[in-house]
Amino acid sequence: MYLYNLTLQGITSINCAVHGSFTGNSKQQEVCVAKGSVLQLLFCDPKTGKISVICSCDTFGIIRSLLTFRLTGSSKDYIAVASDSGRIVILEYSSQKHSFERVHQETYGKSGCRRVVPGQYLAVDPKGRALLIGAIERQKLVYILNRDAQANLTISSPLEAHKNYSICFSIVGIDVGFENPTFACLEIDYEDCDHDPTGDAYKHIKQTLTFYELDLGLNHVVRKYAEPLTEQGNLLIGVPGGSDGPSGVIVCCENYLVYKNLGDQPDVRCPIPRRRNDLDESERPIMIVCAATHKTKSMYFFLVQSEQGDVFKVTLEADGDLVTEMRIKYFDTLPVANALCILKTGFLFTASEFGNHQLFQIAHLGDNDDEPEFSSRIPLDEGETFFYDTRGLQNLILVDQIDSLNPMITSHIGDLANEDAPQIYALCGRGPRSTMRVLRNGLEVAEMAVSELPGNPTAVWTVKKNVDDSFHAHIIVSFTNATLVLSIGETVEEVTDSGFLGTTPTLGCALIGDDSLLQVYPSGIRHIRADRRINEWRAPPKRPIQKCTMNRRQVVISLTGAEIVYFELDMNNQLREYSERRELTSEVLCMSMSEVPEGELRSRFLTVGLADKTVRIISLDTSDCLAPLSMQALPAEPESLMVMETSSEQTGTTSIMHLNIGLQNGCLLRATLDQVTGDLSDNRTRYLGTRPVKLFRVLIQRREALFACSSRAWLFYNYQGRFHLTPLSYSALEHAASFSSEQCSEGIVAISENTLRILALEKLGVLFNQVVHKLKYTPRRLVVHPASQNMIIIETDHAAFTEKGKRRRREEMANDLIEMAKDQEEKALAEEMAHSLRNYEPDESIYGSARAQAGKWASAVRLLVPKTGQTLCQYELPEGEAAFCVELVNFRSQNDSTFVLVGCAIELELRPKRSKGGCVYTFLLTNNGMRFEFIHRTPTPHEVYAVHDFRGMALIGVGNLLRMYDFGKKKLLAKCENRVGYIFINILSFLIQKLLQICVNYKEGGKV
């Protein structure tokens, strides 16, 4: 048997997202996202602002598009999914099963992502009467949606709306009320181009806006109207119709937004504003990449995002059914998104194209600020536009985000932080938002509070005052000779009138009955009633209590000499001792029993761990109380026990009981406990750490979970129908308990040395937590220096400015402004604007970088400490040089030195591919790998894509040449070369030190 693959972390990029009321709650909206083959339902909590995953389902295919729709009169939205399966699938979310249910599945074409097979585009009539699924080329199918007699969704056979020689760019449903459903398509007819051998027809090709109408009476789709467009468009936005708006579409074209509609409506055309002081070429068009519509009973507006990330608010002014004006206003700047979703709860969810996906709270709608609003009525000459100044977030507040590694360029696995467990170092992102992320296996922990204590505590518990309370009332902290009681409120404060005995250590405490508290200490048991009356049970002289366990109705203690004493709460809320006691053959090390099952009076079993490396199951049933039932031998002495009932995935009821055993050798042993006979079976073992394992019961998502403390803290919990045993990315903890308050509804209180910590676990189900370090350009490759464990990263961006290039470009623009001034007044104004332009340095990680001409490159070599993210040294290459490979080389002529070789291309153009050669930069690592120094630059006749250390020399792929270089004082010295055909050498690696593997690329393929 061989391991094929194991997915440690699923796809993090989101290619499409829709929102709606999928759970049937009209006051709540969810977001449905497609992550490659995975369909997820996300809930954005309006109280906490956190994103949680309600449901996750693998479709085992590529999801091409998503759509949400609702039948008239319904309160629940459906999800239409188009994938590479050649089928249209309609899903409904089941709140009872917590999963998606397939309502319909219709096959319409071949499998695969083909240009002529529908699935790339989905559109629906706003009234939910018809659905259109379209291909990139030629084919479109329309399905009629209806209800049967039982009010179930039905779908008709597909109606064809094909058009030969047409390429589709966007499709949207038009809001026409209850008239025949109409769809708008952005198309190009290439028939003339296809039959023109000269290529002249391509230069005069026109894009058309085509309206397709579904005649419900004739059951037929017709092309109702087609209109050629002046500018090339890429996106259609549907405008609310009927009583909500004027209907029609907004066509997002190059540099313009154009409103169009059928009938007598004239076009309303508004330029897309540009950034002031932008370094981009003014001739470069601006395009809208995504949009979102928000509609209420009294108003509607659109948020559109440009390819630079700037978000604009667009509104329409109408006179009756005719739109007279379009207004556009700068809203905020966000990372470029694949989809925007505006929720009723006031959130904006952005599925970012690159980097983390973000959730924003819409604080303002931008109506009452000083930002200028531009109108289609403002007269402008052709080609002129409006200008605005970018700024920080003003209308949006970031409240949460979902980590995304997209795109991950390369990675390295190693324990560079000396943590006894390897980390994954991933180079991610693009441009100025690029990052180096350190991934560690473990749940991310949020510290809510950390307080120092007067000594080193031994244990901690939380208790409620009443069984119906939502939050805990006290934190009980035990020391070796005292007990500290803290009250939980807006702040955590010490109290002295709680009824707990503070002059002795506490062995255990809990809420017993409905409103009483119980404290077990070495000399006895203290029963604290709600009316402050206290009953005490004293331990026999010279036989103090060693161990204890309890639930809401039962208490079991172990006295010195391995004697077990059992107590149970009677109907009068009195704690009664059982008449008999049980002496065991070995010292009691730990004990546990489960919570009282629902509908029963007591837990049936007591589990006891003994010093003879056994665990005993003892009955607590009234017929054979304290009678031994079964025994299990252990590989080491037990440190702690925890009996927990877990839910069955099929029925959702608590039906399986497990005994978790923490051993002193650092292992966790889990066995199934038979609820009838008490037998143990199905043993499973997991190594957790070097310290003895202590187990505690906590609540995660209102369900019992197991918290284990060893040299590292672990959490064993149920999430979305699966059990997860995951370490915490946090320092070692010694004792823990569940914690709940108004400020932290579900957390954990723990002790570590002399501190009390309140922790929250927010990102459940995530295998890795991330530490992010920012980079300047898109990272390409990395190498690790073995001695210092430092990392050398090369970063390269195409069509980007270097720092010198930016300063030169600003100076050119400033001089142009001054030269354009005609009189003294204009010259003074131009001088002021030029000064502002020269000092304009926006944060590119927020606003993105300006785009230079094709063939311009910006590159840098960075020496970074991976543990802290500190940049020790950075070298920026000249403009036009693109770094593509990096390697550490030890030349045999320089035995005691390690060199960094960086291979580059000079003024490389991608289409068509051409360059002015390449070069190799040589750097010397100094100060034990803490610095590097530039030595020399070696020009090459072709681009350099691969460098490798080979037998004390540098083996370099120079275009289609394989060259061997030795170290020289002024440049590298070429020793020999070999031509490898008409190919480019991309990767050099070694197999068994002597066998050389060369990976090369043809123009249209690859070969090894």
Question: Predicted regions span which residues?
Answer:
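Large eukaryotic, non-enzymatic subunits of multiprotein complexes that serve as scaffolds/tethers
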Residues: 1-1008
